[in-house]
Amino acid sequence: MPIRIADNLPARRTLEAEGVIVMSETEAARQDIRPMRIALLNLMPDKITTETQIARLLGATPLQVDLELVRISDHVSKNTSAGHISAFYRPWDDVRAEKYDGLIVTGAPVETIPYEEVSYWDELRRIFDWSQSNVHRTLSVCWGAMAALYHFHGIEKHGLPTKASGVFRHVNHAPASPWMRGLPDVFDVPVSRWSEVRREDLPEGRGLSVLADSAETGLCLIDDPAMRTLHMFNHLEYDTLTLAGEYARDEGKYLPRNYFPGDDPQAMPANTWRGHGHLLYGNWINETYQTTPYDLADIGR
């Protein structure tokens, strides 16, 4: 089934060119089914790229998905035009009375700042609390995952001596988990972060389980059933050249490992994680669909 996004959202042209089926509101209304309602709280500076990456993965699932773009109410984006934000994003204050099958919380370039010093931390805490009553399942990504674990469980993040950047081999520790269905025993995942959450800091008795990790970069994916949340520290949504773009932005300071052939930044990297991203997001959407109430009003009851 296709994904429904605004007709003039820039991601639409990109996805249609890739063969992803994108549905108009009129076409969606003709289908006598309830679509999955997914909110994307996009904290990334380059919002258009992140919108496209997430929509690509959700649009490949076998369900009709309505993707709604949400922003922090009292934060002004410096890297995405005000026109784009105004046209396509709703502030959280405007949607807080509504209910969603799923919520995706992205990362943000604030990893080196204490949580309480992030300008929108108070609102993000309210959003995390709101997700427990108004959202059926949540997927938190990178800094969003660290922030959620800190908010819900008091787990601190730790700064890294240098940026963890590259494509790393990860171990699937729970192949029978519905989140990991179809993923191989070992699989590649792009990593790009300055901080980490450590296994030894995970509290006992909270039901947290490690689904995947890497010998080189640590924890990758944690299931948090009590909060109905999947915490993903890395980036299966990344495009083939996302890490290359970050390397150029950082002026060549942090060469991504296991990425450029022969460590030559002029060489074209191979995307070895695309299928893994589709599997994980497909599993998340499918499990959300299987367990969410048919009536959105029943979410949180």
UniProtKB/Swiss-Prot annotation:
EC number: 2.3.1.31
Pfam families the UniProt entry points to: HTS
Reactions catalysed, as given in the entry: L-homoserine + acetyl-CoA = O-acetyl-L-homoserine + CoA
Catalytic residues (UniProt): 142, 235, 237
A cellular component term, taken from the record's GO annotations: cytoplasm
Pathway this chain belongs to: Amino-acid biosynthesis; L-methionine biosynthesis via de novo pathway; O-acetyl-L-homoserine from L-homoserine: step 1/1
Residues annotated as binding substrate: 163, 192, 249
Function: Transfers an acetyl group from acetyl-CoA to L-homoserine, forming acetyl-L-homoserine.
Family membership noted in the UniProt record: Belongs to the MetA family.
NCBIfam families: metA
Protein name: Homoserine O-acetyltransferase
Species the sequence originates in: Novosphingobium aromaticivorans (strain ATCC 700278 / DSM 12444 / CCUG 56034 / CIP 105152 / NBRC 16084 / F199)
Organism lineage: Bacteria, Pseudomonadati, Pseudomonadota, Alphaproteobacteria, Sphingomonadales
